């Protein structure tokens, strides 16, 4: 056996081990990111919308600080409605298309996938229509969101 082959096997094993500790993102989150990218101004990234205001990001409480934060508040409530219908919005994938900053959901009306797609579509379009106020990124939620 060629000694170089002996070096390749451990490298492959190490790369698989390293990859296994990276937490996977749900397909739904990836799709939601793609929807956001479709609707927001080019100078912004989808990541700028995480940890914004009181509701954009994980959890939420208090009163939304602005129109953009209200988009996240409505999105959170929409996901809550999906869960009441025994639909897991965090894991459910769906079919959609982006064309010229417009989003189309293709799953059957009334299905779990369509419900989640409509939640994400509404939020992404709302993001695109709302002003981004830099001072609302990473705000002190204990102070502003009670």
From Swiss-Prot:
Protein location: Secreted
CDD domains for the chain: PLA2c
Disulfide feature: 54-145, 56-72, 71-126, 78-119, 87-112, 105-117
Tissue: Expressed by the venom gland.
GO CC terms of this entry: extracellular region
Gene Ontology MF annotations: calcium ion binding; calcium-dependent phospholipase A2 activity; phospholipid binding; toxin activity
Cited PROSITE patterns: PA2_ASP (PS00119), PA2_HIS (PS00118)
Enzyme class of the recorded protein, top EC level: hydrolase
Signal peptide location: 1-19
Keywords: Calcium, Disulfide bond, Hydrolase, Lipid degradation, Lipid metabolism, Metal-binding, Neurotoxin, Presynaptic neurotoxin, Secreted, Signal, Toxin
Top-level taxon of the source organism: Eukaryota
Annotated InterPro entries: PLipase_A2, PLipase_A2_Asp_AS, PLipase_A2_dom, PLipase_A2_dom_sf, PLipase_A2_His_AS
Listed EC numbers: 3.1.1.4
Entry's family note: Belongs to the phospholipase A2 family. Group I subfamily. D49 sub-subfamily.
Name the record gives this protein: Basic phospholipase A2 beta-bungarotoxin A1 chain
Organism: Bungarus flaviceps flaviceps
């Amino acid at each position: 056996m060629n000694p170089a082959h002996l070096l390749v096997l451990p490298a492959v094993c190490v790369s698989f081990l390293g990859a296994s500790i990276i937490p996977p993102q749900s397909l739904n989150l990836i799709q939601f990111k793609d929807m956001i990218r479709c609707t927001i101004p080019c100078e912004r990234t989808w990541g700028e919308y995480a940890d914004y205001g009181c509701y954009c990001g994980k959890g939420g409480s208090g009163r939304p600080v602005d129109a953009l934060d209200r988009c996240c508040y409505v999105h959170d409530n929409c996901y809550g409605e999906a869960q009441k219908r025994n639909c897991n919005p965090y894991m459910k994938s769906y079919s959609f298309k982006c064309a010229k900053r417009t989003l189309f959901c293709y799953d059957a009306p009334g299905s779990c996938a369509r419900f989640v797609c409509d939640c994400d579509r509404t939020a992404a379009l709302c993001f695109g229509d709302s002003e981004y106020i830099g001072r609302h990124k990473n705000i002190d939620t204990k102070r502003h969101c009670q």
